[in-house]
């Protein structure tokens, strides 16, 4: 879980003066299309489409973001987008499906996923990097986890009947498409 949190929220540190080096996560490396919204701004379908267009303009025709990571509150807001569609529901099914998993704009197709470590009001106190909801849009194949040392289990001294061990490894976030990515924060609690 610490690795997953660091990939999203890590803060860059060079490791001088006796502190350990740390990497910048997605919220730290996305700078070209990073903005803070006015307090209480609500995420709209038009704004979503505008962000996708800006990503397409900065990254080129094949490089608009294709994965959106948002906290649960914003995912619920996106679930309410209609994209001008009419929904037909079989009445005998007695089931209404609302979640939006894929959204298509003129800039391309994007998968929408709620993520527990994207800054938002629904994050736990221990993991909240911000008190405002954030939106991350990335081109998935332009980001990779690069291992400096592949994780491995290292056994430690035996303690009674218990065998102790630890997982050791080093990694960093490799990013090749920062210009195509979007990071917006400051959305209202209800999206």
Feature-to-residue mapping (PLM):
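Short, glycine/acidic-rich hinge or "gate" loops at secondary-structure transitions
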Residues: 1-22
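Conserved active-site beta-strand-loop modules that form the wall/rim of enzyme catalytic pockets
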Residues: 64-67
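Sequence/fold signature of self-assembling virion shell proteins
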Residues: 18-50, 77-191
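Short, basic/hydrophobic alpha-helical segments
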Residues: 49-61
